[in-house]
Amino acid sequence: ETNDPETINKATELLTEATNRILKWRAWDPWWVEEVMDEWLITRDRLEVQLRGKYGEEVINDILRLVDRFVEYSEALWKYWHETGNDVEKLIEDLMSGKAVVIIRGEGGVSVHEERIMLKVDKTSTGITVQLKLNDLEGVTIKVPDVFRRTMSEEEYERFINDVLKALRGGLEETDGFVDRSKVAMDTMQVWQAVVWALLYPGRARVRISAINVNDGDVTIAWRLRTSRESLKGKILNIADKLSDEGLLAFMFTAILGDGCVRIAKDGRGNDEAVIKIAISDEEFEGWEPLLWRLWDRFRWHKYPGNAVDNVVFYSGYAIDLARAMISVLPPILKDILDALSFEKWLNIKRISEMEVKWRRGEMQIEVAGYKFTVDVQQDDTVVLEHRAKDDTEVDGVISALRARYGDGFAVNIRKSGRYRVVAIPMYIFERYDDIKERVIQVLCKKLEKTKDERRRVITKHLRRLAPIKGAAAANTTKT
């Protein structure tokens, strides 16, 4: 028992949120189980359509039987919920009438027990989690087919399992895995992840529903899968220098599926920009560094520290190159299965891989007095060098560095752009300085090579002004 008013108030807030969510979704009714069953059946249909005609009947039927086991287990949950849903209603009634026995777990958690259901509510760094734990729904053992062995030659399979498959497992385990009774396991709310995880671990696996998540926006099932294999967590990172290029890319692929974000954003000029990000905890980042530095030569990345997390981000052409390279190491049947599962992260990786590499972030920049400036060919028929500063202090630092290098008469323009301050060097200023002009010419030549539209004529005109010989050569190329 506790009489501390603050502790009681916090517990009351958690229970109020849980009660509101359960009432909102009528979680005691089995409608949400039926939606999950429908999702599994849709997944089954998509797999059959995608794979039929490409692979043998035995392979396809084995995959469909795997999905059928999840459907059967969902049906068992549906029957179970018809019998135990009343426990949820009673739990809510007891909470509202003050009859419930509430267990306070520290400052950020409470629990309420019924005969077959336990309500578990926790305050996290990102919000409140509300779970209904099932006390007596048994798990099931499923047999997972080795679809890779059946779709590869013996030589291909041997190479795949010793290199790529091990790395694919390692990436998933590093981001989403944990050890359960000495074996590797994971919890997921996603149907696609349950299928992919299972297929990467052929043999026998144990599946059980560990909890029902009553979220603010929906009700989901937490699936727990435990394989018969020892965990690789931490082991792949320890041998990053020994991974093949294919293994390195396979590891990154599943790590990004686990803890990554893949999207097409808009850059500062409104153009599509590919972005691939993976979040790594502060305490784990040191272990990741050897692997990340192996990627550096081909796929440059940026590190952005966050709240106990480091975000490693690949932009533009480097993100496109990484997406293409990761897809290239996947076996055909895995790509077909991912296509059938059709989940957002995979679709975005494919979309990025199909984008045209117009530039790689930093490729259209030059360094002036120790600061990076983007070479911007503007619509008003001029070229400007722009540096985005986060605040006035950085602006003052840029101006001081420029004038220390080129003299007090070095003029710049300052303007606001969203949350940034832009330091702009006009063309009539930078063309007076040969070292700056030479770097601008190199970037304009790169732009010219990668530009197909009317802007080629504009770039050629500027090259003629800055470097008459190169400009003339570019003009001849444009005409032909």
PLM segments and residue spans:
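Internal intein/HINT superfamily modules and their associated LAGLIDADG
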Residues: 1-480
